[in-house]
From Swiss-Prot:
It comes from the Eukaryota. Residues 135-154, 628-648, 693-707 have a biased composition (Polar residues). This is Coiled-coil domain-containing protein 157. Residues 276-544, 579-615 form a coiled coil. Keywords: Coiled coil. Residues 135-163, 316-336, 620-707, 731-752 are annotated as: Disordered. Signal peptide: none annotated.
Length: 752
């Protein structure tokens, strides 16, 4: 066998076997409910929660990796053992349910981890107990045949059937019809089993009633097909929404698994319950995603306001900067014109100074010639000349104080006049000439220095002008870029603003629709509360007769017939039988009146819905977002509501175990097993002829499904505005009243 490890043919055979085993397990789960035992392969997880599709995709034959292929082969063998063990455990649970005469088991806790041998032994023990239980009613068959009269036919073309025929069918059931849902097969045998528990003397005043059996029900009812079709359409819409939002879809995986295992056959009750649970997960995930999108929208609106304020500030800053640059350019132009004017003036002054310097040089030559003549006379005045030289040095150091130097020269001239009268005229002339020459020299030097400074300043001004022109060009280019960027940002901001305004308008419309739906729901809740108070008052009136609840009569239901029933009156130990019968008649009158009032309300509500559908009030959302086809129009949205009222499936039985009204209006204690209110009465709309009225007192347990129908009908107008949220609300409304039957269908959800 070692050479076969990793063989592709062997692995494909194992994968096929695993697929078949999983299909058989799903079929058993639909009849017995999911069993919660630890997995043999993965002890830390439940066997019913393993994702076989993901495991088969992971452990596959890889041509380039022999080690992984051999590991996958071993894992597939272990998975075959795990699935076989789970199949035995689920079959064991199904056999226990048959032995205890229960339709579906209650919610089971996680079972212990069992070995293969222990599981096989427990399965064999359960099978032996079932065989013993089926052999016990056989001795009573002859007595039932002798004491039970032949039943009369109730409809044309149908033969009469006796209770012994039904008992034989129960003890030796035939193979189920292919494609018939389990919800329409199993409940038939339960009332007949209950009838076997009473003595044979009770059949003297009884008569058998015709009912629809497995042989007559060749196809599933239209209501089941309609409900499942609507559920699949809604599931497709939910899966498409999850895919469009890039969200994981639990319903998509479960739908693929159901299609692989069931194909196009009708789904059983447990599969429909699991489908609804997975769909509820996806709807919850979508609601969380919508809340996150709303938070992002609010954050985007805040950012939009901030960007709008920032854009206004930038526009103001840009305008201020443009004004400052404009003023700076005007000032620069004015300074440039002033500098040009000063330059022309300086050029004219320099030309004038040059001509003056030439004339002064000629005068200086003449004065030098005259001073040479006067030098002979100036020998006597050397001391004064030294002082004059010192004064000349001081005059050279203090160029700016020209007037003070001239005053000092005049003082020196006065001193020279005082020193000698002889050289007064010569000294004064010499001083004047000297002062004039010195002033001319100083003036020439100052002019030259001023000219050099002006030339340097002119060069610096030229350089600064070039720099200013370059900076002005750069500023113009930058301003153009800033204007272009601001224009693009303004256009982008306007586009974003328009998009956000459109989104805001759509959200406001959705908000208005939700507010309208909330108002309608509140009005519906108030109306339902008033009806609940009335029903409680009527229930108190019925409870006021305690004698009616004594075990004085027993009902025997044949098959699924609830329109006609036989009552067997047994002698009581206390009271008068006539009084009890009169009180029973009074209570039956009260029940009939309650049913007539409820039928009147349902008829009025149905007429209102039809009027709204004819007026086109249900066309509020595009057809591609609804679960009904676009070709059906407004009337295509009403079949799911009607399917709720006539479906015998799990939707019709979910409210019955938790309804007090359905139990107290029967006028007798619940002597039969607790499954009786959930089997025959709710299934009558699927099997009874259309012409039979549903007015029998034994069908009073149907009042709770009618109430759920009223709740579904009143919320139909809100489905057109937001179908996803309404589905979530309807699922939450239906989930508290499912009772034990619904909890048995509900699988254990994995932690997200």
């Amino acid at each position: 066998m070692a050479h076969l490890l990793g063989s592709q043919a062997c692995m494909e055979s194992l994968r096929t076997d695993l697929t078949d085993l999983q299909g058989a397990i799903v079929d058993v789960f639909s009849r017995a409910g999911p069993v919660r035992f630890p997995s043999w392969k993965f002890p830390d997880r439940m066997a019913c929660d393993l994702d076989m599709v993901a495991l088969l995709e992971h452990y596959d034959h890889v041509p380039g990796d022999p080690e992984f292929t051999q590991l996958s082969h071993a894992v597939l063998l272990e998975l075959v053992i795990d699935r076989l063990l789970l199949l035995l455990q689920s079959c064991m649970s199904y056999l226990e349910n048959l032995g205890s005469e229960q339709m579906m088991p209650p919610a089971q806790a996680a079972g212990p981890c069992m070995s293969v041998g222990l599981t096989v032994r427990r399965f064999w023990d359960s099978l032996l107990r079932l065989g013993t239980l089926h052999q016990q009613p056989l001795p009573q068959k002859g007595a039932n045949q002798r004491e039970t009269p032949t039943s009369k036919p109730t409809t044309k073309g149908e033969p009469a059937r006796s209770p012994e025929y039904l008992t034989t069918k129960l003890i030796k059931p035939s193979s189920p019809v292919l494609g018939l849902p389990q919800t329409c097969q199993e409940p038939e045998s339960i009332p007949v089993r209950a009838s076997l528990q009473f003595p044979a003397t009770t059949f003297k005043n009884t008569r058998s009633v015709h009912s629809q059996t497995i042989e007559t029900a060749l196809v599933p009812c239209d209501a089941c097909a309609s409900v499942q079709g609507s559920l699949q359409k809604v599931g497709k819409v939910v899966i498409s929404l999850c895919q469009s939002q890039n969200l994981p879809s639990s319903l998509g995986q479960f739908q693929q698994l159901v299609q692989d295992s069931m194909g196009l056959r009708p789904l059983p009750a447990a599969t429909v319950g699991r489908w609804a649970a997975e769909q509820r997960k996806d709807l919850t995930r979508l609601s969380k995603h919508v809340e996150a999108l709303r938070a992002q929208l609010e954050e985007a609106e805040g950012q939009k306001d901030g960007l709008r304020k920032q854009a206004g500030k930038l526009e103001q800053a840009l305008k201020q900067e443009q004004g400052a640059r404009r003023r700076q350019a005007e000032e620069d132009e004015q300074c440039l014109s002033e500098w040009e004017h000063d330059k022309q003036q300086l050029l004219t002054e320099t030309s004038d100074l040059k001509t003056k310097m030439a004339t002064l040089e000629r005068e200086l030559k003449q004065q030098r010639e005259s001073t040479q003549a006067v030098e002979a006379k100036a020998q006597q005045l050397q001391e004064e000349g030294e002082r004059r030289a010192a004064a000349e040095r001081q005059v050279q150091q203090l160029e700016e104080q020209v007037q003070q130097l001239e005053a000092q020269v005049q003082l020196l001239v006065g001193r020279l006049e005082g020193a000698g009268q002889q050289v007064c005229w010569a000294s004064t002339e010499l001083d004047k000439e000297k002062a004039r020459v010195d002033s001319m020299v100083r003036h020439q030097e100052s002019l030259q220095a001023k000219q050099r400074a002006l030339l340097k300043q002119l060069d610096s001004l030229d350089q600064e002008r070039e720099e200013l022109r370059g900076s002005l060009d750069e500023a113009e280019a930058q301003r153009a870029r800033v204007e272009e960027q601001l224009q693009s940002e303004r256009e982008q901001g306007q586009c974003q603003l328009r998009a956000q305004q459109e989104l805001l308008q759509s959200l406001q419309r959705e908000k208005q629709g939700l507010e309208q739906a909330t108002t309608d729901l509140r009005l519906t809740i108030l109306e339902l509360e008033r009806e609940l108070e009335e029903l409680k008052e009527r229930e108190r009136l019925l409870v006021a007769f305690p004698d009616l609840h004594r075990p004085t009569e027993t009902q025997i239901h044949g098959g699924r017939s609830s329109s006609v029933e036989s009552q067997i009156t047994c002698p009581t130990d206390s009271g008068n039988v006539t009084d009890h019968m009169e009180r029973q008649v009074q209570s039956n009158d009260i029940r009939i009146r309650v049913l007539q009032e409820e039928n009147g309300r349902l008829q009025s509500m149905l007429s209102k819905i039809r009027e709204v559908a004819q007026q086109g009030g249900l066309k509020l959302i595009p057809q591609d977002r609804l679960w009904s086809p676009s070709s059906k129009g407004t009337q295509g949205a009403t079949p799911p509501v009607q399917a709720k009222s006539t479906s015998p499936g799990p939707l019709g039985r979910q409210h019955l175990p938790s309804s007090r009204t359905g139990r107290t209006l029967l006028g007798q204690p619940c002597t039969s097993p607790p499954r009786q209110p959930c089997t025959s009465p709710p299934r009558q709309p699927c099997t009874s002829p259309p012409r039979q009225p549903c007015t029998s007192p034994s069908r009073q347990p149907c009042s709770q499904p009618s109430k759920s129908l009223l709740e579904g009908v009143t919320h139909l107008d809100t489905c057109t505005q937001n179908p996803i949220k309404v589905l979530v609300r309807l699922r939450k409304r239906l989930s508290p009243g499912r009772g034990q039957a619904s909890s048995a269908h509900q699988p254990q959800e994995r932690p997200m």
